[in-house]
Amino acid sequence: MNRRGVLGLAAGALAGLLGRRPVASAAVLRPPGALPPGAFERACIGCFRCAEVCPTRAIRFPGGAGLDAGHPFLALREAACVLCMACTEVCPTGALAPIPAQPERVAAEVRIGVPVLDRRSCLSWTGEGVCSLCAYVCPMGSRAVELVGPQQAPLFHAEGCVGCGLCEEACPVEAHAIRIVPTGSGTGGLT
């Protein structure tokens, strides 16, 4: 084998090792009760128990190797979190801290992500219709979203939102006028 072949094998082996190392990723939405990035990846053993008990199948695991291989994430556009907290009850390592499924505890302790509203796509904000589905499905009510003006346009309050994604899942706009982004991503708010 020549020098180039040896270097290629070494680079591939190193990439494989790095792909399996727990690396913090703040770019994905984690299930409720998730420890902070870094601590979560070190604690999670990828046992799939959280995904198995998720009634909506919102908890997914990425395939293959890479930064988030073996660590659960939420696919809220496809299925929202109904805040049942079953995932936090079955986590054997504490990567998902137990949170009782009591509304006041959920409101105080769960921060999956923050809402971002694209007013250019929202039916109520563009004047193309009165929708308001996001407000009707929100379990946090006016703490997280209120309806304003004659078009009953949604106005989101990140501090009152738990990031469950029910609004994102319910949005009838093809491009989804509302989406939940990871907390601390610096993109919460309006566009």
Where are these regions (language model features)?
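Non-ligating segments of multi-cofactor redox enzymes
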Residues: 1-191
